[in-house]
Amino acid sequence: MSTSTPTSTALIGSTGLVGSHILSTLLTSPTTSSQVQTISRRAPANPTNSSRLSPTVNADTSTWPTLLSSLVPLPTTVISSLGTTRVAAGGIANQWKIDHDLNVDLAKAAKQAGVKNFVFISSAGTRGALSTKVPYSQMKRGVEDTIQSLDFEHGIILRPGLILGEREKAQHAGQGLLYGLVRGLGRWVSLGVQDRFAQEAEVIARAAVKAAKMAEEGKAPGKWWVLEQDEIVKLGREEWKE
């Protein structure tokens, strides 16, 4: 990225597991955006007190699309890792409002404002044989389709598998058990095997940041770029350089 052309990145979902790693990566890497703008319900972590962070805190998520389109300077790239769970949201209908509707509205607002690139953390399986029967896959697929239809200079989708990392708490007992099983399995299988179905949040975050940077530098493989699990690992771990 040329230092003569400073860029700004807006991050939605900066307090979640993947989003918090995206934020820390953006703030600590010397080769990323000169300014990082966030929109969130609560203030994001900024342990280094970086002057590059410009947070907007508003608990009313219905205002976020307007807030996004009003950011100054206008971000070159928007990254959304926004998402919740059915348990946390209080049901599928409420989860749909966040995972689908709000992400769709944010993408539309970004396009209308003139944002060049949009990066979305989706999920593996959105195009699988059973995806039309799974509400979670339908949510993510709908957002992907919207981003593609908006025709950004670059639309970038990451489809990670099971996301590993230290959460504040498991959303339900079954989730905690699943993560424990995967962690235990990791002691017996190679990292390459684990990479086929689960990735660390930090790796996903780094892949998102690197993909955004490549788009801004004109190095993305195409204007519509979908990163499946193997490419996430490639960009976020194997080829990652601070």
Curated annotation (Swiss-Prot):
Pfam families per record: Epimerase
Biased segments, Polar residues type: 35-58
Targeting presequence: 1-87
Annotated spans, Disordered: 33-58
Protein's GO biological process: import into nucleus
Origin: domain of life: Eukaryota
Keywords: Membrane, Mitochondrion, Mitochondrion outer membrane, Transit peptide
Location(s), subcellular: Mitochondrion outer membrane
Main location per the UniProt record: mitochondrion
SUPFAM superfamilies with a match to the protein in the record: NAD(P)-binding Rossmann-fold domains (SSF51735)
GO cellular component terms given for this protein: cytoplasm; mitochondrial outer membrane
Bilayer topology term: Peripheral membrane protein
Family: Belongs to the FMP52 family.
Name of the protein: Protein fmp-52, mitochondrial
Gene symbol of the encoding locus: fmp-52
